[in-house]
UniProtKB/Swiss-Prot annotation:
Protein species of origin: Saccharomyces cerevisiae (strain YJM789) (Baker's yeast)
Protein's UniProt keywords contain Ribosomal protein: no
Annotated region described as deca-GX3 motif, given as residue ranges: 34-74
Protein name, UniProt field: Protein YAE1
Keywords: Cytoplasm, Nucleus
PANTHER family (alphabetical): PROTEIN YAE1 HOMOLOG
GO biological process, one term: protein maturation
Function statement: The complex LTO1:YAE1 may function as a target specific adapter that probably recruits apo-RPLI1 to the cytosolic iron-sulfur protein assembly (CIA) complex machinery. May be required for biogenesis of the large ribosomal subunit and initiation of translation.
Spans through the membrane: none
Domain of life: Eukaryota
Family, similarity comment: Belongs to the YAE1 family.
Gene Ontology cellular component terms for the protein in this record: cytoplasm; nucleus
Length: 141
């Protein structure tokens, strides 16, 4: 003899036919809610973990992009009218140094670590340093 309190959802097959539609709906809602709560909790943990791991790298790259763009803007403001190549370089840098390109998965290893120097940062640091030398302005270290 089965005790009704052994299974609060009364999921024994012989009891299944006696269940009301409201009880079935309640059980379904609770199951879905539990499933969703579990997924949300897991995603929040993993998202925070990923943010904590990736923030230092992203912040460092963002700072480097800011330095590159700031120097290019200053040079373009001062010398852009007479140097068409400099103006074009600034526009190209705006396109190439967008966040989705700087933080592209293809640039990182499977653990999302940079193996060497960032190719776009290296490229644009070299370009900026060339213009800095041309106009006798301190270059990026």
């Amino acid at each position: 003899m089965s005790n009704t309190w052994d299974d609060v959802w009364a999921s024994d097959s012989d009891v299944e036919t006696e269940r009301s539609p409201d009880l079935l709906k309640l059980r379904e809602n609770h199951s879905k809610r539990g499933y969703l709560d579990g997924i949300v909790s897991s995603k929040e943990e993993k998202l925070q973990e990923g943010f904590n791991d990736g923030f230092p790298t992203g912040a460092k790259l963002g700072k480097q992009v800011g330095i590159i763009m700031g120097i290019l803007l200053g040079l373009r403001t001062r010398f852009g009218d007479e140097d068409e190549g400099l103006s074009k370089a600034y526009i190209d840098a705006q396109k190439e140094l967008r966040i989705n390109k700087v933080l592209s998965k293809s640039i990182f290893d499977p653990n999302f670590d940079l193996q060497e120097k960032h190719p776009l940062i290296t490229k644009w640091t070299d370009i900026v340093n060339t213009y800095c030398e041309k106009y006798h302005v301190p270059s990026i270290q």
